[in-house]
Amino acid sequence: VALTEGLIVFPIMVLAISLCVEFGYMMYQWNLAAKAMQLGVRKLVVSEPVTPDFNTVFAFDDTQSGQLIDADASVQSTCGAGTGIACDAAMMTRLISGNLTGGQRWPGLANYFPGITAGQIRIIYELSGLGYQGRPGGPVVTVRMEIGRDAIDFPVIGRLLESIGIAFPPFTVTATSEDLRSCPGPCS
């Protein structure tokens, strides 16, 4: 009788323990993604824009010099995943890999969330309604960064139950731009 009970309970216990471990792993991955996104958007608000049409979309109107800029979320400059517009490759490499050379040392997104690629990131700049026409530091925009991944795979439970994993939720982090410059003075 004891052997029969053991044969029934043992697989259930292994499954329950595996589920707890893999759920913890899933939460760990979500936390890594959230931290990477926080770092990424923070870097974007103090760096040169990565979208190719930023200067065209947010060009100042010289006839309205000194006038306040209206908030208009429909005025956007977007690049990255799902947009069909490629972000600046050098800036994206720097954002993902970081810059650990010279006097500038900061980690990239991959240091916090290994496996992240430029193809999973979407970056959106939109008018925030702050600032004025002709502002020396450029327009004040809202910077939004999103990451999209397919699913989180469960190594043990996924194979046992033949599941495809749990969909990774889209992470969106938003911040208001500061100076949108990567270096002091003119960048070369």
Q: What residue ranges belong to the model's regions?
A:
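N-terminal single-pass transmembrane signal-anchor helix
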Residues: 1-25
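Membrane-proximal amphipathic alpha-helices
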Residues: 22-34, 49
